[in-house]
Swiss-Prot record:
Keyword terms, alphabetized: Disulfide bond, Endoplasmic reticulum, Glycoprotein, Lectin, Membrane, Signal
Classification via Pfam families: Yos9_DD
Domain annotation MRH: ranges: 99-220
Localization: Endoplasmic reticulum membrane
PROSITE patterns hit by this protein: MRH
Sequence ranges of Acidic residues compositional bias: 375-394
PANTHER family cross-referenced by the UniProt entry: ENDOPLASMIC RETICULUM LECTIN 1, OS-9-RELATED
Location, primary (coarse class): endoplasmic reticulum
Glycosylated residue positions: N125, N271, N332
Name of the protein: Protein OS-9 homolog
Binding residues annotated for a mannooligosaccharide derivative, in chain numbering: W115, R180, E202, Y208
Membrane topology field: Peripheral membrane protein
Amino acid sequence: MWRWSTGVRTMLGYAMCFLALGSALTVRLHSTRTNLPQYLTREIGDDEFEELLRSSASAGHKWHVEQFVDGSRCYVPETEQNMAPVPDDLLERGIKLVEEATVGKKLEYLPISYWGYKFINSELNKTVIQHKDQHQVLLGSMVKADPQTVQHSLERDEDSYYISERFGDGDLCSLLEEDRTVEVQYRCKYDTPLEIILDLKEYETCRYTMLVSIPSLCELPEFGPYTRQTPANTIYCTAPATPEFNIATLVEAYKPTFLGHGFYHLAPHANLTHKETTAMLMYHQQPIPGNEEDDGTMDSAFIKHSTMAYMQLLEMGLLNGPDGLPFSEEGNFTVYAKVIGFDGGLITVTRFQISHGEVIIDHVVPEVLEDMEQGNSEDYEQQAPEQLDEEEAELTSQSDDPAIMRVHLQEFITPEYDAIE
């Protein structure tokens, strides 16, 4: 049966936390401890942690515990932070500085990934665009003259204030059947002499946060760091269940490609001789349910997310046929892929088919692939059908189950490539 060594599981777990670092800017997710407020953090043992909970309860302190997928827990005190008072016109003055710094400009952000991003501030409106070659997706826009679309506010984090603007009216998101939206945060950053986009994250499906540095905001001390008047509280955390390892090991062995929707594609570097599968995905969001009592809702969401990840693989030319050429949406093919968690453990095996313009994706019982210790996506296509007859193995879901995604290809491939991200 297909197994991961302890070292590889540990390696992938640390790498997943490293790759997902900073994945939330304004929302608190519970996937990694990096999403906690930037207070003082101290690591303690499990016994000391339990004693801290008991003593805090006895003393009547306000606190809560965050549980993370790496097995660690954090004690977070619920003490309101005192910020320096601000002038009533601070938001108005800040917006004026932002406008003066960005009007008539187009800021571009080209991370090491498939998509690039643009922030455009014209005389009439502001827009945020996701693009690749000739394909564009509108993430959000704001008409300056329309009070209904202008949504800006003065916000604060642990150390300073910033300006937040929310753009609606993005392109339709097929998964949510709603328009995309993006929040743009304008911040003072002393180490950036020009107006630049610092980051863009999709913190939820079709919901984005863009971080823009506006150096002129630093002229107003309230937007600078360290405006908090009281010292930070201490957050106490237990150690992760996954031991640390050298991140260089993963970099030497695999090339991770972020596909969106919680998925990474892991491909061995071309200069290596090992034959690990190229049809291998890593999923770092909530795992799919494993008990029979679950109503299948999360499983259905996982299928939708994995379908989008496969479509992204297809669009990027990372799914190849036996001839070495990339599959295309016009062809008919089947690909089997192992899906692992951030700890390297096997979550499931998925089957992805395109047949006569229809996309079909479902789970396959992992045990049916126990003879496939090595191979690539072409081997899966050739070998798996022989092992998947109905007498030897059953699919985890039948065709009328919501966990099977069966849609027409044109719902994913549109002229604007709206649904591929």
